[in-house]
Amino acid sequence: MQNKFARTDLAAEAVGRLDKAPEGVCADTLSLHGCEVSRVVITSEAGAEALGKPMGKYLTLEMANYVTRRGQSFPDCAAALRDLLKSFEAVERAQSYLIACLGNRAVTPDAVGPLAADGIIVTRHLKSSLPQDFAAFSSVSVVRTGVLGTTGIESAQTIRSMCELVRPDCVIAVDALASGEMHRLCRNIQLCDTGISPGSGVGNDRAEISEAYLGCPVIAIGVPTVADAAALSDSADAQSLFVTPRNIDELVRSASKLIAYGIDLALHRGLGIEDIDALIE
């Protein structure tokens, strides 16, 4: 059963609920390194209103199964994520990056950002002190924003302050998302150039993290970890509930690692999977 009113952060899912793509929305699929990718481009305000998403490009890596680091499909999925990230002009032309990892490490479904941060290869300080040794690396820094309830500071405000300090060419924001379809949980990874509104998928909207607010391009990467219970039940009680798989701790760790490796491969162009293993383990 699919409830068309169930919340979703995924543009591909929102398009799939409609009989056809509305005016101002282009949707198609492609294959990349053996992985299926859904592409949605919203080109008009009418299209944005129809989908409930800002205008921009949305790319969703759709994996048939859960992907672990030791799984055979991990290298292909990481390579696909790398190429999708590099397909955004803001990423390809930048030389310095701030990876903004959102979420609450103490709440498993919301721990995607903090866990992904553990796998990001940071180099900004090394390029400053050892420029010749790290000339082949991009300048990468990471900020773990925490959540408003434990920091007292909006994530957007934290990231904006960091942008003023380190002056990145591009911000890559990593966060957990919500879906209306159980099969998408931890099997889809969405990338978009529209920024992100933390908590929007679960009805807890926070300040928007966008180019307009930060002053530099923002690419958002997210994986759905919770599903709106309205997708499973028409009961009025389900409208305020979200559900998650029983093994969500394992799934979130695996999805976060895949995101981190995809970012590392995209930003540090000379590295391979084994190189990243050696640097972060």
Question: Which residue stretches match the model-derived regions?
Answer:
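N-terminal amphipathic/basic leader segments beginning at the initiator methionine
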Residues: M1-M55
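A structural signal for small-residue-enriched, beta-sheet-centric alpha/beta enzyme cores
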Residues: V143-R144, Q157, A173-E281
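Glycine-rich phosphate/diphosphate-binding loop of Rossmann-like nucleotide-binding domains
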Residues: N104-S138, V142
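A structural-propensity feature for long, helix-poor, extended segments
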Residues: D133-C163
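An N-terminal, well-structured beta->alpha segment
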Residues: A46-V91
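Short glycine-rich or small-residue beta-strand-to-loop segments that form or flank ligand, phosphate
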Residues: T60-A64, S96-V107, V142-G146
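Gly/Ser/Thr-rich loops at beta-strand to alpha-helix junctions
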Residues: L102-D110, G149, A176-G180
